[in-house]
Amino acid sequence: MGLPWYRVHTVVLNDPGRLISVHLMHTALVAGWAGSMALYELAIYDPSDPVLNPMWRQGMFVLPFMARLGVTQSWGGWSVTGGTATDPGFWSFEGVAAAHIVLSGLLFLAAVWHWVYWDLELFRDPRTGEPALDLPKMFGIHLFLSGLLCFGFGAFHLTGLFGPGMWISDPYGVTGSVQPVAPEWGPDGFNPFNPGGVVAHHIAAGIVGIIAGLFHLTVRPPERLYKALRMGNIETVLSSSIAAVFFAAFVVAGTMWYGNATTPIELFGPTRYQWDQGYFHQEIERRVQSSVAQGASLSEAWSQIPEKLAFYDYVGNSPAKGGLFRTGPMVKGDGIAQSWQGHGVFKDAEGRELTVRRLPNFFETFPVILTDADGVVRADIPFRRAESKYSFEQSGVTVSFYGGDLDGKTFTDPADVKKYARKAQGGEIFEFDRETLNSDGVFRTSPRGWFTFGHAVFALLFFFGHLWHGARTIYRDVFAGVEADLEEQVEWGLFQKVGDKSTRVRKEA
């Protein structure tokens, strides 16, 4: 046919059988990729330390999505939560991967069948014998089925009625597990951090979809609306489908980057705003102050802080710290976290407690500045020692540790104090192993960053695709020079002007 690469889909424009075939093949590729990727991630995933070396630090992409829907155990005997797997059954990580690969194979066979048997009676109008699709009816069928699926997911899977529920955690991502969730029908269901709203909205949206599907199956569209929206044109279906997909992509990019109700921080890592706002730092300080108020010493108070919570309060776990073109998981950057060193409290020679100013998300290097309770700069690491006024040597800065490996230790040597001050810029101080994976010390983003970037970019591309195909279907008569509802068959070369019966070509004698 000699079609250029960007026009090859023309071959399925008026061929419903092969249009089904290529969609089946596409779904086969998606399911096959998902299953294969899951097996690859399972092969490289180290489940030994879910606290300091969780799946999101290791760059796992599909495993967190399985875990949030209730798949948390492996046939290998381990669990996402760190315990031993107890009777994972078929729906383990490996079972889900295998199911996707088997599904991929079946879809491939279905695609081949529909490619070979493309000219089915189903696609022909019994009155005329011409190829015809009842697109409004098909729309109703698809809407009904998707509504049924949406309702079933909310009413059965998420509620635990027939399914595991979903991943639920506390606001600080410390005690997460898979639990059944009751729907929240009140105003709190609109709280973006309330998982009960997710359940209620799936049930409600499913019911609306079922009703809408039945409506479109029983009520025919008015003729004017049918023509205005080009409901008889398959490219209208393409355009509106692309619109649905790009809208969904924009939504999930937003929920991934900003929220954590459906993307728990235990599975996908913290959001950048939790670092920006000192979210975990404030909670840690609140817990410490509460313990001290109850009579605990600073050492005891800091020792009660979960290592998991302290690890969230570390800049290297912010998804905004990694450049988009730095490939690899987080552990290939700063390394594999080994242990929490403890919370460093800095003081100057006059006994004032100093706070190290924390590194903002978009800085790779940042001056080491220590301020007192009033925000006055009392110490820094100068760029030029000749002009320094607040150097650690001049200010007599020391650091004492509470909790962690260095609990109870105090360092007075300026070289040691500077080392810990630089580390304190990044939040809580941890010891990292950079040798095992040959980590280069340059921060990487978490799967949260990759997912957001990918979906935002593709949403934008699909938005333009929607405009393109929408314009093609609405202005089809303008582009082709043929009216959309022209009844008489146009014979090319019969008329001097296409479709104008008064301008017949004169045949040469």
UniProtKB/Swiss-Prot annotation:
Q: What biological-process terms (Gene Ontology) are attached?
A: photosynthetic electron transport in photosystem II
Q: What is its main location?
A: membrane
**What HAMAP family does the annotation carry?**
PSII_PsbB_CP47
Give the protein family: Belongs to the PsbB/PsbC family. PsbB subfamily.
Transmembrane segments in this chain: where? 21-36, 101-115, 140-156, 203-218, 237-252, 457-472
Query: One Pfam annotation, family name?
Result: PSII
Query: What InterPro entries does the annotation carry?
Result: PS_antenna-like (IPR000932), PS_II_antenna-like_sf (IPR036001), PSII_PsbB (IPR017486)
This protein's GO cellular component annotations are: photosystem II; plasma membrane-derived thylakoid membrane
This chain belongs to the protein called: Photosystem II CP47 reaction center protein
Ribosomal protein among keywords? no
Key word DNA-binding present in the record? no
Cross-referenced SUPFAM superfamilies: Photosystem II antenna protein-like
Q: How does it assemble?
A: PSII is composed of 1 copy each of membrane proteins PsbA, PsbB, PsbC, PsbD, PsbE, PsbF, PsbH, PsbI, PsbJ, PsbK, PsbL, PsbM, PsbT, PsbX, PsbY, PsbZ, Psb30/Ycf12, peripheral proteins PsbO, CyanoQ (PsbQ), PsbU, PsbV and a large number of cofactors. It forms dimeric complexes.
Role: One of the components of the core complex of photosystem II (PSII). It binds chlorophyll and helps catalyze the primary light-induced photochemical processes of PSII. PSII is a light-driven water:plastoquinone oxidoreductase, using light energy to abstract electrons from H(2)O, generating O(2) and a proton gradient subsequently used for ATP formation.
Q: Name which cysteines form disulfide bonds.
A: none
Record's bilayer topology term = Multi-pass membrane protein
